[in-house]
């Protein structure tokens, strides 16, 4: 299956195909210098399979986890390209999850003011969400994604077969982003997640999630309006991640927790049920004041107000700009339950 992201001069294809990794050179221009970036948690054969199809590959394996998404690793990537004589005609290929994609994308956006970038996601979270849309970033001072750029990939290659090596917790981590999109845009997908065997329907979950995000990004590439809806669960989720000092909980797990206060009544109960079915945490046992302090550093804060996304009904959303005082009370009430 091929989806086309229509962004004018920055348009690109999203290839979804079982076994695509072994024939990546049919879809990606690897006949040049290529920096392949992966991490220690990704099976080595994935990056090696790509390297074997490249004319002049250079491979970097960064440590697994959020600690790699910072300036030291970013500098390592840029310095490696510099020392190996990379020019604007060369490319970076990310083979990994969200951390690898964000880091590699930002390095490719920055080196020589931008070189080609290909994304080959190997986690469910990156396959359903972070591999498309052009957001690239690194962390600073415990704040997620505070330094970054919009830099669209030239192509995204999704091979669902790589998910077979993922542990159940990583599958659940990715499902959080699919639940987020279903809760705000696609009641039919949400119903599938509620009633069907999720693992048996992963291909459908991936395709439907990507179609939602593709449509949103095409309408609002730089997140000035509609794309903010994709932050459902992320404002409080990022606060929890920062509170946790980027350790302990995965990104999707934090997003799952962040969705709970942004819904109510029957909608909240349905979201809670799907989160539990997917194996995601639902216990808000954090210090509300510390989470709030972390949230005030969030990119969605605007002076003494903050942009928030609510799910009033499954498959719909409401964008609001509320005072920080009101938002603080929302957090306190949710975390007190």
Which residues does each PLM region occupy?
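Residue-level signal for inorganic ion chemistry
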Residues: 17, 36, 70, 121, ...
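Solvent-exposed alpha-helices and their adjacent loops that cap or buttress functional pockets
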Residues: 6, 85-87, 110-111, 139-140, ...
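ATP/NTP phosphate-donor binding region
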Residues: 1-91
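Phosphate-handling active-site elements
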Residues: 83-89, 112-119, 242-253, 268-269
């Amino acid at each position: 299956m091929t989806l086309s992201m229509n962004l004018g001069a920055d348009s690109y294809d999203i290839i979804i195909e079982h076994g695509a990794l072994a024939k990546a050179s049919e879809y990606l221009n690897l006949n040049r210098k290529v920096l392949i970036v992966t991490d220690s948690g990704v099976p080595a054969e994935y990056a090696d399979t790509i390297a074997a199809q490249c004319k002049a590959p250079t491979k970097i394996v960064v440590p697994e986890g959020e600690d790699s998404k910072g300036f030291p690793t970013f500098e390592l990537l840029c310095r490696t390209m510099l020392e190996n004589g990379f020019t604007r005609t060369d490319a970076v290929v990310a083979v990994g999850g969200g951390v690898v994609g964000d880091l590699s994308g930002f390095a490719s956006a920055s080196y020589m003011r931008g070189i080609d970038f290909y994304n080959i996601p190997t986690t469910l979270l990156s396959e359903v969400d972070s591999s498309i849309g052009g957001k690239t970033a690194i962390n600073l001072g415990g704040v997620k994604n505070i330094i970054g750029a919009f830099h669209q990939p030239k192509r995204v290659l999704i091979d669902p077969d790589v998910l077979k090596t993922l542990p159940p917790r990583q599958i659940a981590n990715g499902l959080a982003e699919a639940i987020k999109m279903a809760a705000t845009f696609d009641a039919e997908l949400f119903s599938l997640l509620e009633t069907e065997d999720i693992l048996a329907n992963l291909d459908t979950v991936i395709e439907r999630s990507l179609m939602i995000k593709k449509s949103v990004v095409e309408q609002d590439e730089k997140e000035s309006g509609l794309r903010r809806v994709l932050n459902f669960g992320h404002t409080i989720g990022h606060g929890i991640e920062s509170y946790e000092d980027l350790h302990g909980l995965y990104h999707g797990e934090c997003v799952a927790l962040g969705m709970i206060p942004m819904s109510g009544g029957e909608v909240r109960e349905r979201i809670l049920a799907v989160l539990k079915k997917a194996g995601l945490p639902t216990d808000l046992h954090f210090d509300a004041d510390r989470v709030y302090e972390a949230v005030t550093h969030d990119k969605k804060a605007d002076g003494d107000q903050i942009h928030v996304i609510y799910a009033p009904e499954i498959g719909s959303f409401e964008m609001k700009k509320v005072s920080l005082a009101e938002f603080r009370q929302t957090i306190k009430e949710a975390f007190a339950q």
